[in-house]
Structure formats: C-alpha cells, structure tokens
C-alpha cells in the first residue's frame, strides 16, 4: 500500500455534505505512515464534475472524474475493500501541489 494507489473504500456512514458510499479513493498519505499506522489518508474520486479550485481532473478506469481534495480524510485500513489501480507520478505530484496550496498560510 503506497501513495498513489487507488482502493475501493467504504465511506459510510457520513454526515452532511461529506462524500458518501463505496467508491474509489487515492491514498495520499506518505508511505512511511502507510507502513506503520492502521490508518491512511485518502482523497475520494467522484464522477460529478465541479469547478472547485481544489479538485483535480482525472481519468480512472476509462471514466472521467475528479479527485476531491476538498474531501480528504483519514480512514482505518479496514475501510479499504480492494486495490483497483494507481495513479502515475505526475498525477500524484499534481495532487501534492494542490494539497500544499490548501495547507499553506
């Protein structure tokens, strides 16, 4: 399990406007965390296209969608159902750049 892997994850139960249901999500936590903790940080994928500055377009399994960086969360690894793919290094770098903008002062 490494940064950039895409897993089918169970995001239920949720509250309010949190992205829900079982869906693909990309692991964004660093590999050291992924090896040592029982949790991972993920960003869910969605097929609903929104013009938000902190979403990044993607194509996964031949479907166009977005990575919802405004919906990142920490999950117990028990919520990971199965690995369904991964993203390339350029896409991961794009994700990390956007996350840096989110968390910079």
Regions found by a protein language model. Give the residues of each.
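Conserved functional hotspots at enzyme active or ligand-binding sites that engage polyanionic ligands
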Residues: 1-105
């Amino acid at each position: 399990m490494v940064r950039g892997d895409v897993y089918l994850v169970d995001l239920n139960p949720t509250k309010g406007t949190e992205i829900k249901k079982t869906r693909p999500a990309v692991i964004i936590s660093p590999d050291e965390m992924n090896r040592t903790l029982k949790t991972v940080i993920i960003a869910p994928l969605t097929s609903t296209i929104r013009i938000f500055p902190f979403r990044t377009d993607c194509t996964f399994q031949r479907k166009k969608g977005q990575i919802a960086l405004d919906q990142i969360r920490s999950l117990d690894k028990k919520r990971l159902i199965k690995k369904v793919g991964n993203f390339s290094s350029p896409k991961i770098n794009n994700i990390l750049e956007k996350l840096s903008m989110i968390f910079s002062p």
